[in-house]
Design a protein with these regions (language model features):
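Active-site neighborhood of thiol-dependent amide/isopeptide-bond enzymes
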Residues: 184-197, 217-220
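Short, conserved charged micro-motifs
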Residues: 95-99, 189-190, 239-242
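ATP/Mg2+-dependent ligation/transfer catalytic cores
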Residues: 1-171, 193
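Core alpha/beta catalytic barrel or barrel-like domain that forms the active/cofactor pocket
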Residues: 120-132, 162-182, 212-228
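Short, hydrophobic beta-strand segments
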Residues: 85-91, 178-185, 231
């Protein structure tokens, strides 16, 4: 890592990646000490200001690395050279903070394994827009690929330098809409790699004077963007445990999602 700084990052409910940067030299101390964080950061919105809350935030937290090593990526032509470290938030006693999204995923996966002797494998497909592109219906078209080929090439090269594998990077249904598809992985690794891939995409776009957005709706007249989650249930020996009855249950849950959750 020749860049002098490494950024310790978390992803929050606003969809932003946030964190703090420290010198690369001595950054191994983060594994033990972490960095200071505050509960009030949970109220930060995607637009910057904090949301209004009834009660004041109290106490302190620690931002610590979730893995032993940071991820480095580079692009010589764009003069990109970055070191990013996926993190998680813990309380001062070292236990996971209740609002840490990565810790929530870890807890859910442990519950699935311990209570039901099951594990998940997921494949993620993330759609995004490059705004300002031609106003044409370009579903999977060659024209849409060629129009953004310089960006897609740079994006792919940065992903490759970061060690992030992907299945495809192609035009989608909307004008200026594209999709990044990742291979099937352990859910925790898949989530980490998706967050890194999104951040890398934004950084590449900024260096090329493009505007990339993962917003679900960018216009009242174009199709929206989403994240597709393809998953399979397995027992602890890796045998498939998807079933017809299970599929019916999942289908019912999907149809009733509006009544059991809010976003």
């Amino acid at each position: 890592m020749s860049h002098p700084l490494v950024m310790l990052l978390i992803s929050d409910l606003s969809g932003r990646m946030r964190g703090k940067s420290v010198p690369v030299r001595g950054s191994e101390k983060l594994l033990e000490d972490g960095l200071g964080w505050i509960p009030a950061n949970a109220a930060l919105t995607c637009f910057g200001p904090m949301a209004k809350v009834e009660n004041d935030a109290l106490g302190e937290l620690r931002l610590i690395p979730a893995e032993n090593e940071p991820v480095s990526f580079f692009h010589e032509k764009l003069e990109i050279e970055q070191n990013w470290w996926i993190g998680k938030i813990v309380r001062m006693d070292g236990f996971p903070w209740e609002c840490c999204l990565r810790s929530q995923l870890e807890s859910a996966l442990s519950l699935l394994q311990d209570r039901f002797q099951l594990q998940l494998e997921v494949g993620l497909e993330q759609e995004f827009y490059l705004t300002g592109r031609k106003d044409q219906l370009n579903t999977n078209s060659l024209e849409a690929f060629c129009e953004a080929s310089d960006f897609l090439k740079a994006y792919a090269e940065c992903l490759d330098s970061a060690g992030i594998e992907f299945k495809s990077l192609h035009p989608e249904n909307g004008p200026g809409q594209y999709e990044l598809s990742l291979p099937k992985l352990d859910p925790l690794k898949a989530a980490d790699q998706l967050q890194l891939a999104k951040g890398i995409g934004r950084h590449c776009a900024a260096r090329m004077n493009e505007h990339l957005t993962f917003s679900p709706i960018v216009s009242s007249v174009t199709i929206g963007s989403g994240l597709h989650v393809h998953f399979s249930l397995q027992d602890l020996e890796g045998r498939e445990r998807n079933s017809i009855d299970g599929a019916r249950t999942v289908s019912y849950t999907h149809l009733t999602l509006p009544t059991i959750c809010s976003v």
